[in-house]
Amino acid sequence: MTEKVLKKHLKEKYGDFSLVRLTGGYTNDTFLLNGTLPPLVVKVTNKFNEDIENEINCLNLIQETGVTPKIYELIETDALQIIVMEYRKGINGQSILDNNELERTKELYKNLGASLAKRIHSIKYNYTSSGIRECTFNEFNLSLDFVPEFLIANSMEILQNINDNKEEWVLTHGDYGIHNVLYTDTNTLTVLDWEWSEWANPLTDIGWVCWFTKLHYPEYADSLNLLFIKEYKINNPIHLSPEVLRSYCVYKVWKVLHKVKKAPQEVQEEWIRRLKWTIETDIFNFVLMN
């Protein structure tokens, strides 16, 4: 069905092609158009997907940095949105660590830090959203009936460490990390999947990289996160507090909990587990916080 729809809307302009489904860093239905020159990627989503509208606005804003694929065209059908974008070379960053290529992973984490500081967080909020979400921390609702009361109470206490100030906001990716990048042999980094991007404090992205690494790769987390933060601070000398970083991680987990409030019970239970883990775990127990 998808191939039929895509050929109907794309064949006349881009020529004949076959579809190759892409995984590793791409979400939704994402395909390589095999046979086009130059190679193209299309992302296919439900027409009423607000996350995709947010992503498109973000990609248009950040296009000149070179850290994202270029958008060539947006096609809307009765039921779908089809985004035609540039194909970028590279392998999924997470697969490098999964294959135990530790030295290359170290270089990747340095690149993650430098790119985040120089090419993403360098875009400051100027009190105009440009169609990109704005952080809602100051109006955040912790009332979800499937979350245990003691976790709500603990979260409220931790979130008091945050003093959210729009003057500190920058463009944030929202789910930044090795799982959402492509990385080449020449150390070129492409950042994918900007659906969760928002204007927010830069600590949301910094904390989330460390959170993801500690959750999934605890044996490597401290050394890799230290490399990431060192490189970030070389390019953006920012004050980092373990307490505030953890608070922003709790905020991020709550944002996901709101996204899964209609999801199956096992999905909700997994994110409740992650909230408890975030509250109890010393994620930022390495040096270089000042």
Model-flagged regions — what are they?
Residues 2-13, 121-174, 184, 271, ...:
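An alpha-helical support segment within catalytic cores of ATP-dependent transferases
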Residues 52-56, 203, 222:
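Conserved strand-to-helix beginnings and helix N-cap segments that scaffold or border functional pockets
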Residues 30-33, 159-204:
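Active-site acidic catalytic loop and adjacent metal/ATP-binding pocket
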